[in-house]
């Protein structure tokens, strides 16, 4: 019975996925994922990326966000990306495959950043979802806390943080934590984000000294 339920749920998800207009547009444009459109909408409203910036991209695969940011920061910019999954190369992106929760992977990532600070840290990380919020939300909050920890390590004063968060237990506390570290914090729900999804994007700018 459980397998039948999962099969029906998976079929509905696939049907919804391939009928999604942003998935179809991404395929037509040769984009890596529909996440490209989410970031484009955020950039139009919040202007996070500028030529010459250095950006850290956490949870980067398959590369939709990195693919977009390359067009915004230009040839003098740099993206340092990390994901547990493999990602096909993108010109201008220094990709590290590994589990961000692993100390050795984190160390390697920090070494790639080097001594200079970055202007933007962005995270589209998400755990493997079970469909049970009581299980999924704590896993998600753990990942976004790690992303915020990366900000503390590498983000320059005045820098920006963009993070995908699933609303649920711990969300309000996390938001307060971010507000203590940044001068301006907004919550975005891009059109390309499915309406029934709990995901929202926190856009934090002006990292405090």
UniProtKB/Swiss-Prot annotation:
GO molecular function terms attached to this record: rRNA (uridine-2'-O-)-methyltransferase activity
Reported function: Specifically methylates the uridine in position 2552 of 23S rRNA at the 2'-O position of the ribose in the fully assembled 50S ribosomal subunit.
EC number in record: 2.1.1.166
Catalysed transformations (reactions): uridine(2552) in 23S rRNA + S-adenosyl-L-methionine = 2'-O-methyluridine(2552) in 23S rRNA + S-adenosyl-L-homocysteine + H(+)
Binding site for S-adenosyl-L-methionine: 63, 65, 83, 99, 124
Short name of any one Pfam family annotated for the protein: FtsJ
Keyword Plastid: no
HAMAP family with a match to the protein in the record: RNA_methyltr_E
Active site: 164 (proton acceptor)
Protein's name according to its UniProt entry: Ribosomal RNA large subunit methyltransferase E
Enzyme class: transferase
CC terms in the record's Gene Ontology section: cytoplasm
CDD domains, A to Z: AdoMet_MTases
InterPro entries: RNA_methyltr_RlmE, RNA_MeTrfase_FtsJ_dom, rRNA-MeTfrase_E, rRNA_MeTrfase_gammaproteobac, SAM-dependent_MTases_sf
Subcellular location: Cytoplasm
Keywords for the protein's UniProt record, in alphabetical order: Cytoplasm, Methyltransferase, rRNA processing, S-adenosyl-L-methionine, Transferase
